[in-house]
A protein has these predicted regions:
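Nudix hydrolase/Nudix homology domain
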Residues: 41, 113-177
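Acidic, metal-coordinating catalytic segment for phosphate/diphosphate chemistry
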Residues: 1-23, 95
Length: 177
């Protein structure tokens, strides 16, 4: 499945910042493993490096962010989101016309302890934390107001992805205790 989010009707010729990302949907007891900073919620994952395929990129990102070893065989492609945003405000305050192509995978929960994950210096600097997000919390974050201008970009995509996941009952069988 592919979803295009483009509220400003940007065309590719107007895009000044493009990246390819991967993220993992990891469900634990009806909630989802997420990272949070400055009112932004993200599923674990990140940018695909040059020459890296999508599955291997997610294996690397999950090891970096959660300290857990996964293999490509443990990931099920779920949904691709192509998200455009006009005048996206970067961390440095500059504005870009952004296009992010993100592939989301369903990944089994492997029993790791979120409190035991070691955060990087950069993550600690930005107040990053790991936690669980319930479907009730998911509804609430879409209503939150925030001083962070990037919040809407990330949280709206998270909402679309997880609501699609929750509507697919057959995907709920991958959790491992």
């Amino acid at each position: 499945m592919e979803i295009i989010m483009n509220k400003d009707n940007l065309i590719d010729e107007e895009v000044t910042d493009f990246s390819i990302k991967v993220r993992g949907i990891i469900e634990k007891d009806g909630s989802f493993v997420v990272g949070k900073y400055d009112d932004v919620y993200l599923l674990p994952g990140g940018k695909v490096e040059e020459g890296e395929d999508l599955s291997n990129a997610l294996v690397r990102e999950l090891k970096e962010e959660l300290g857990v070893d996964y293999s490509c065989e443990e990931m099920i492609p779920f949904i691709r989101v192509i998200h455009y945003d006009k005048d996206y405000i970067k961390r440095d305050g500059s504005k870009v016309n952004r296009k992010v192509d993100t592939m989301y995978f369903i990944v089994s929960y492997k029993g790791f302890d979120l409190d035991e994950v070691t955060l990087s210096e950069s993550e600690r600097k930005y107040g990053f934390s790991l936690g669980l997000l319930s479907s009730v919390d998911l509804e609430e974050i879409s209503k939150m107001s925030s001083a962070n201008p990037r919040r809407e970009f990330f949280n709206s995509e998270l909402s679309v992805v997880l609501n699609n996941y929750l509507s697919k009952e057959s995907y709920k069988v991958f959790e491992k205790k």
